Amino acid sequence: MTVSELNLKVKALLESYFENIILSGEISKITLHGSGHWYFDLKDEKSSISCAMFKGANLKVGFKPAVGDFLELCGSVSLYAESGRYQFIATSMKKAGFGDLEAQFLALKERLQKEGLFDPRFKKSLPKFPKKVGIITSKTSAALQDMLKLIHQKEYFLAKIYIFDALTQGNNAPFSLIQALRKADDMDLDVLIIARGGGSREDLFCFNDENLAREIFKAKTPIISAIGHEIDYVISDFVSDFRAPTPSAAIDTLFYSKLDIEQSLDLMEEKLIQLWNHKMQNYENLLLNLSKFFKFNSLPKIIDEKIKQSHNIEKQLNHLLANQMRYNELKLDKLQNAYLQHENFFNKSKKFICIRKNGKIANLEDLKSDDIVILSSQISQKEAKIL
């Protein structure tokens, strides 16, 4: 008997004995394919099975399934003869309550909310011009590279960036994140970003850890939670001082661009000039009214005295304006010096090389001979072969 013959016999056997059965479990992974077909894994406490629901069947389902949904399926078991891989083909689907992940998330969220960990009274304000910024994430992640690239594009060279490497997925991730958070919180930073790119509900579930949530709450450093995408919510989002929908959005929230700072200074100068002109116009009008009043009352001496007072006031205003302008010039010089000091760091970053294999960032120790990789810098990329 050949392999093909065996697979065909097993396929016929499975499909004849396991048809029109009810299967229940929790979605642990799902792909909504562009073709309209749905491919997902269904699990219980001990096992999982690959499932598919083709377009013709899922058009009748009144919702889009997601990781964490607890479902009841009707369908049959089938085997793909070419690979010998069997799966459950669903013909109908309905929700059967919450899955384990969703239930754990909601229970912890409710309990921490009752304890007051999400109360706005405890939220710390973010700094307007941060000078020491920490980022907790995987040092090899694409999210980190995107964040550093965006900082460089903004030309915000006032801040020094501290990177704290941590696991952002898996059972060991909460402990790793807590250790990194404690280390960062002891460094007197202006603000701290906890970041991770997108992923499945299971991939992001380490950010629903209770111990991590309590560590974030008691930290003295303002914390931004930037986990996943816009639609992803985790416990760290609620307990942090600010929630950013993505890692890049955290950078946009925290950092002004060089152009923004220049425009802000120009606006301040314009407002000072307007204020000065307004006050001078008021004093001129007052002087004119006083002159008219005392002229009719034949009090030239009093008019002269008021004129002198007006001149004194004008001198005081000139002095105040000059001091304010000097202060703005000193502040601008300070910002410019800080910009020049940190500009060198970002010029060096242009020489950094990122190695990607199969579209993912690769570690040098994982590469083998004849591997095809993509070498990327800030300005170009090349394909290379490992010798």
Curated annotation (Swiss-Prot):
InterPro entries, alphabetized: Exonuc_VII_L, Exonuc_VII_lsu_C, OB-fold_nuc-bd_dom
Cytoplasm as UniProt keyword: yes
UniProt KW keywords: Cytoplasm, Exonuclease, Hydrolase, Nuclease
GO molecular function: exodeoxyribonuclease VII activity; nucleic acid binding
EC class of the enzyme, as a word: hydrolase
Pfam families, alphabetized: Exonuc_VII_L, tRNA_anti_2
Record-listed E.C. numbers: 3.1.11.6
Compartments (UniProt record): Cytoplasm
Gene Ontology terms: cellular component: cytoplasm; exodeoxyribonuclease VII complex
Predominant localisation class: cytoplasm
GO BP terms, alphabetized: DNA catabolic process
Catalytic activity: Exonucleolytic cleavage in either 5'- to 3'- or 3'- to 5'-direction to yield nucleoside 5'-phosphates
Quaternary data: Heterooligomer composed of large and small subunits.
Function summary: Bidirectionally degrades single-stranded DNA into large acid-insoluble oligonucleotides, which are then degraded further into small acid-soluble oligonucleotides.
Family that this chain belongs to: Belongs to the XseA family.
Protein name as annotated: Exodeoxyribonuclease 7 large subunit
